[in-house]
Amino acid sequence: MNISELWRFPVKGLRGELLKEVAITPNAPFPLDRRFALAHGKSGITYESPKWALKTEFHMLMHNLDECLTELTPHFDETSRLLTILRNGVEEARTFVDDPRGQEEINRYFKRLLSKTDSTIGPQFVQALDFQFGNIEEPVISLINLASVRQLSETIGKHIDVARFRGNIIIDGASPWEERDWVNRIVTINDATFIVVDETIRCGATLVNPDSCERDLNIPKFLQQNYGHMFCGVYLIAKQEGIISPDASISVSN
């Protein structure tokens, strides 16, 4: 088994960034993964008072009319604190995230973009401080098995892009659904070690085609109908530091 791809998603719900390597820190997510998010205006979550919350409090692909988020690619420079948003490859917004005027500008941009779903107060661009805006509160890293996605694709007779699952670590060379037996086991990649803490249940976000931005495949329904569950992938928590990169070998032990 080996790593096929590594991804992080600086802004929850938007497109990800393909990585050449990742420095793993114990009990921490990928650097910058889900660092920022778009909280619903009525959630009470603000840039000044950020907090972890359930995904229902945020704009993300699970929600109808938020599909346009998959057209957006964020680039964040941690040194300058400059966030740039590209839409289909064209720059649409840029702002220094710690500047109050910049925060107002990015909020106005997303209010225009998401006016059909959050027209009163508007989305609030927020930053996580010592946590991430993940789907669960623990500092997890998401792993997706390409073989499982391929088998599901063959079963339903339709191509499924692994990008629908928004995983951090994409692996190849495992058996289909082998990862379902890894809960409470240790994954080792180079010097880094992880414990598998849970399976990942799939939600309506996976319905969205990352290329067309349309809801065209009901992935949770297909999983339930064909396998009797709605899981695809597992969550890891890092336990030992190390550097991981594509093509690195993966081992699983008790």
Language-model features and meaning:
Residues M1-N254:
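Metal-cofactor-dependent catalytic cores
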